[in-house]
Amino acid sequence: MQVTVEKKEGIHCSLLIEVPANEIDSVVSKEINRTAKTIKMDGFRPGKVPAGMVKKKYGEQIRMEVISDLIPQKYSKAIQDEKLAVAGIEVELKENKEGQPLKFVANLELFPEFEVTGFEKIEVQKPVVELTDKEVKQMIENLRKQFATFSEVDKVVEKDDKVTIDFVGKKDGEAFEGGTANDIDVIIGSGQMIPGFEDGIIGMKKGEQKTITVTFPQDYQNKDLAEAETTFDITVKKIQQAELPEVNDEFVKKFGVKGGVDTFENEIKENMQRELKFILQRKVKDQVFKGLREIAEFETPKSLIKREIDAAKQNLLKQMGGAKGFDVNQLPDNLFEANAKQKVETSLILDSIMNLQEFKAEEAEVESLLDELVQAYEEPEKTKEQIKKNDKEIANLKALVIENKLTDWVLEQAKVTEKTEDFFEVIKENMQAQQAGF
C-alpha cells in the first residue's frame, strides 16, 4: 500500500492511498469462489456454479463489497502510520478497475492542536444568594398554589385569579399569526403570558372588553414579533378565585412527608439549598466555559459539530417519548448548531487543559458527590447502590469531579466578582436556560 499526504492545512488533511491491483483482485477472486459454492443458479446443482458465471453476473457487486470492507482497513492503517488524530473522514474513490491499483482519497478533519493561555482575562460574576425563611415560605406558598381549587366569583380581576378570556393580537393594526385565541385560561401573575399582558387584565370585570398595549421581549422566539409593540383586544368571559389548601399533615402527605409540617418545612429548605448549590455551580461553570471559548484560538472540526447536532436530535426525540410519525431528522441543523458548537469547543478546550494539568478524581471525592446527588431521590441509599453498579454512571461522576476541579483551577486565575441575586430569579433563569437548550 502506498500513502501520499496530498495536502495538510490547519485541521484539514488529504491522504491519497493506492492499493496494489493483485491485492484487490486476489480478495475479489476468493470471494467469487466462495460465493460460487453457496449461490443457487438455474441449471446448476448447489455448489457447482462455475466461478466465471458468478463473476459475469455478480462480479461488480462483489468487487464493491470487497472494496467497502477494505477501504476502512486501509485508511485506518494509514492514519495510524501517519500518527494523525482524526475527528472526521470522507472517502473519495478515484480509480477502481480490475487489474489496476485501487486509488482513493481520504479527506480528513483533524483534532486541533492548541494551548490555552490568558486565563486572567476571563471575567466571572459569582452569584450570591441568601436563602432565608422568607424564601422557604414563598416556596411553600407556591406549592399551595399548585393544589388550589377555583370557584367563579363576581368581582374585578386580581392577582392569582384564574380568568377565561378571548383575545386578538395586532401589530401595526393587523392581526398577526398565532395572536388570536378563544376561551383561554390564564392565572394572573403566573407569567404564562408575555410581560405586561397579565397586568393589563387586572381590574377588569366579567364581560368587559379592553385593548392593552404590550411590547414583546427581545429574545422572543418569533423574530418578527421580538421587541415589537403590539395591541391585544381582550374580552373577560369568566373570573375564578383561588382557594389554597391549609398547610397541615394531610397537605404534606401529598409530598410523601410523614413527619408533619415541621419536617416538611425542613425538607423544603434542604431541597432548596441543594438545588441552589447546583444551579449556582452551573452558572459559574457556564461563565468559566464561555470565557475559555473566548480566549482559546483554534478551528472547530465541522464533523464533530455535525455529530453533536445528530446527538441533540436523538436526545430531543427521546424526550418526546419516541413520538411516532415524527422524523427528527427533518428538523434543520441550524436549530441545534449554536449549542452543538459550544459543546464541542468546550470539550476540546477542557481536553487541551487536562493534557497539561493533572486533575484526578479520588474515590472519596466521587463518593461525596454521589452522596449529595442521591439526596434528591425518595430512596437515597437504594439509588446510590444502583448507581454504584453502573460503570457508565460512575465514569460520569468521575468526569464531573475532574470538571469541577478544572473550573476551580481556572477561577483561581480569573477575575471574579460577586453579585447578590434573588433565589426565585435564579431558579427562573435556570429553567429558561434549560428550555433554550432543549
Curated annotation (Swiss-Prot):
Query: What EC number is given for this enzyme?
Result: 5.2.1.8
Signal sequence bounds: none
* Keyword Isomerase attributed: yes
Q: Which InterPro entries match?
A: PPIase_dom_sf, PPIase_FKBP_dom, Trig_fac, Trigger_fac_C, Trigger_fac_C_sf, Trigger_fac_ribosome-bd_bac, Trigger_fac_ribosome-bd_sf, Trigger_fact/SurA_dom_sf
* PPIase FKBP-type domain boundaries: 160-245
Entry GO CC: cytoplasm
Q: Which PANTHER family match?
A: TRIGGER FACTOR CHAPERONE AND PEPTIDYL-PROLYL CIS/TRANS ISOMERASE, TRIGGER FACTOR-LIKE PROTEIN TIG, CHLOROPLASTIC
What family does the database annotate? Belongs to the FKBP-type PPIase family. Tig subfamily.
Name of this protein:
Trigger factor
